Swiss-Prot record:
Protein name, entry field: V-type proton ATPase subunit H
Protein role: Subunit of the V1 complex of vacuolar(H+)-ATPase (V-ATPase), a multisubunit enzyme composed of a peripheral complex (V1) that hydrolyzes ATP and a membrane integral complex (V0) that translocates protons. V-ATPase is responsible for acidifying and maintaining the pH of intracellular compartments. This subunit is essential for activity, but not assembly, of the enzyme complex. This subunit is also required for silencing the ATPase activity of V-ATPase when V1 is detached from V0.
Main location: membrane
Keywords: Hydrogen ion transport, Ion transport, Membrane, Transport, Vacuole
Lineage, top ranks: Eukaryota, Fungi, Dikarya, Ascomycota, Taphrinomycotina
Subcellular location: Vacuole membrane
Native organism: Schizosaccharomyces pombe (strain 972 / ATCC 24843)
Length: 450
């Protein structure tokens, strides 16, 4: 099975631009109830007579009627909406425009295609537009921005970055509906390749998305939309190669598989795994074996699934991992674990035979793997990773005594000594054990000198 056969509908998704959210719906309903003195704006010169007529064509009529009206003259009504959006000092007018505009965009692909480029031209002249709006207006603006960006790539880099930063802030909200809305908006814009790479380069928003997914157990909708964002990201090979290193995503997917969740969530998790195998096999398959994805998937295979796609995903993942396990050596697995930057107590770490056979291999390619251990010890904040890295450096010099000088040369000795006072007892123990091995050599050399 090739992942190129997968379509958007195959992940059991609603149209990503629907953005159904009761919090935002309440704001929209309130906006619809506001009476705006349009004739007063026309008399004051804020609106032209023809613009007043166009506004009247949008008010007091069924949705289908005013959408049809806007479709008949996309240029005129695009200009009208942008004119109303430019009236930032009149929030009621801006909100009216944002609500009517979203209605039209949601129900007319023709208008969506025509309005997007004009909207970006508008933002080109006012890149920080979102910053001038009040909280409710920002939510409505984000809705319109997501709709436009689901259809055509945003050509205003700063405006898109500000949009992502805004979504990142919403993801930190204490209100679960606000967090959900942020992920729904992000889900909409990620339908386009350019926006996937823009999100990946921006960093902050994607990290908050990952944090939301980690904490989404029990919130099926948030979990689902968060996973859908990751699924779209993994269609890009460059992103798929790095996504597990950045977020430890495979481990998280295994946790979700082992939880009791909805079929649509399992479906997305499996689709992400298929993408990772298809787009970045060298970077992900060995990690999947380390995280026991094969065993987790086997648990799902014991269930009866009415969904044929799920059974196909399960069969593909199982057969691929089974075949790969026959060809990957223990050292290949260890190397892949180091590549992730996140270490676990897998069997190779405590195996004396493994270190006797492979310690010198850490020196290959200008000490590439050894330097990765140094980097983990120096910068990683995960307690288990720190403990395992300290242990591995001790095992390395136990099997390759000459390695002591390398640990000192690259500055890792002082860091390991510092870790002897780490708050985690396992980290302290492994750091102490490795320091003892380092100091044993120092004492031995001192005696020789004397």
């Amino acid at each position: 099975m090739s992942n190129s056969d997968l379509e958007l509908s195959n992940a059991a998704s609603p149209p990503p631009v629907e953005l159904d959210n009761s919090q935002v719906d309440e704001i929209i309903n309130n906006v619809r109830c506001v009476a705006i003195p349009w004739q007063g704006y026309q008399r004051s010169g804020s609106l032209e007579e023809n613009e007043l007529q166009e506004i009247e064509n949008l008010t007091g009529k069924p949705l289908s009627a005013y959408v049809k009206t806007a479709e008949e003259d996309t240029t005129a009504y695009s200009n009208l909406f942008l004119k109303l959006l430019s009236m930032k000092d009149t929030p009621d007018v801006v909100n009216f425009a944002l609500v009517k505009l979203a209605d039209t965009l949601l129900n007319s692909n023709k208008f969506l295609s025509a309005f997007g480029p004009a909207f970006y031209d508008f933002l080109e002249k006012d890149e920080s537009y979102i910053n001038y709006l009040d909280d409710d207006s920002k939510l409505l603006f984000a809705r319109v921005f997501a709709l436009c960006s689901s259809s055509s790539p945003c050509s205003v880099a700063k405006a898109f970055t500000l949009f992502l930063e805004y979504l990142g802030k919403l993801m930190q909200s204490l209100n679960p509906l606000t967090r959900l809305f942020a992920v729904q908006c992000l889900n909409g814009v990620l339908t386009l390749k350019a926006h996937r790479y823009a999100l990946w380069a921006e960093n902050t928003c994607s990290f908050r998305l990952a944090e939301l997914l980690r904490n989404s157990i029990g919130d099926t909708q948030l979990q689902y939309y968060s996973l859908f964002c990751f699924w779209q990201l993994t269609f890009e090979s460059h992103i798929a190669q790095d996504i597990n290193k950045r977020f430890d995503l495979i481990k998280l997917l295994v946790q979700i598989i082992r939880s009791d969740t909805k079929t649509k969530v399992y479906r997305l998790v499996l689709a992400i795994l298929v993408n990772l195998i298809d787009k970045a096999p060298k970077d992900t398959i060995s990690t999947m074996l380390l995280e026991h994805v094969d065993k987790a998937v086997q648990l799902l295979q014991k269930r009866k699934w009415a969904d044929e796609d799920i059974t196909n995903y399960l069969d593909f993942i199982t057969s691929t991992l089974d075949e790969s396990s026959k060809h990957l050596s223990t050292f290949d697995m260890y190397k892949s674990e180091l590549d992730t930057g996140i270490l676990h107590w897998s069997p190779s770490h405590r195996s004396e035979d493994f270190w006797h056979q492979n310690a010198k291999r850490l020196n290959e390619d200008n000490y590439a793997l050894l330097k990765k251990l140094f980097h983990i010890v120096q910068y990683n904040e995960d307690n288990t990773s720190l403990a395992v890295a300290c242990h591995d450096l001790g095992a390395y010099i136990r099997s390759y005594p000459e390695g002591r000088s390398l640990i000192i040369k690259y500055g890792a000795k002082q860091r390991i000594m510092d870790l002897m006072s780490h708050p985690d007892p396992e980290v302290r123990f492994e750091a102490l054990s490795t320091v003892q091995l380092l100091m044993t050599e120092v004492c031995f050399l001192s005696k020789i000198t004397l």
